Structure formats: structure tokens, C-alpha cells
């Protein structure tokens, strides 16, 4: 791992400084929301880095499948996920879609990328469903299976490496989780770090 890198995703380097900037953006935007945002100082970089990596995986999935989306499609994707988030925010203890996004590590500056992520997923689902929207549970199940495989293959091809400072990638959820702490743990005290999703399942 290169010095100053938070993660290496394929040929793309996510620098620690760019991650620090997004974490700062998250903290600034979260201030007015007070106790709604429960991410700890340790969790914030992992939550932000999770999404930066997910965006890169989706970019690779799109490239693998000849998918490109327009700015208009990305804007539609953002509108769709904002609408979904607004309707589910209160159930999850948030006052708005913005609060829900922040609570999951998505800064206001990352929203355009989130819209593209949604648009790319939608375009892939339509493509593998014969160019039409999903209208049945059977179609949904088939498309989901294809999507999960394509996402796994994209992630695997990127040979993702996360700096131990921030944790490791759990491939079962594409989430950056705490890495096993072998330095500061007293003898005989097990680390609470998760061991799921150590490698891609494809």
C-alpha cells in the first residue's frame, strides 16, 4: 500500500487526503442534525470510504457490460434514491433524506456520484432483462442473481486493497469494516473485528 493511500481500487488511488476532505464535509453537514447522526469518529472514514469504493465497483461493472449513463440519467437516479430515502428516513430515525444519507456516510458532495451509481444499476438491470423494465418477481430474482455475480466479478477484478489504518473490505456487503487489531489488544482478548467476506465469493 502506497503511503498516503486510503485504498487502491484497480488503477485508481483513493488518497488519505481526499478521504479526509470528504470526512470533513460529512462532519460539517452533520453538525446541524445533532444526535441524529450516530457515526463515531472511527466509523466516519470507513462509512465514506465504503461508498467511494462502491462507486468504483459500479463504474467497473458498467464498463464490463458496455454501459454508459448520461448526466440526465444520473440526475434521475439521484431523484429516485432521494425520494426513496425521504419515505424511509423517519422509520430509521432521520428527519430527512439528507440526514439518512449523512448517517450512512454519503456527503452532499458525493450525491452526483450516488445518482450515477443508481443510474448504472438501473441500466444494467434493464439490459440483462432484455431491454425492458422488471415487471415480475421471477424477472427480479433472475436479474438480482446476474447483478450480484457481475458486481462480485467487477470487485474481484479491481483487486481492492484498503489501508489497515481504515480497516478492510467485507466483500459480502462491499463495506469497509474494522480490521483485526493485533497491536493494541491485551493477550487473550479477542478482537471484535468481523471475519465475513474476506474474499470475493465468485
Which positions does each model-derived feature cover?
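Acidic/polar surface patches and capping/hinge elements
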Residues: 108, 125, 129-160
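Alpha-helical structural motif
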Residues: 15, 93, 120, 143-147
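Short, low-structural-confidence N-terminal segments
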Residues: 1-43, 149-202
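Extracytoplasmic segments of membrane-associated envelope/inner-membrane machinery
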Residues: 100-111, 116, 120-129
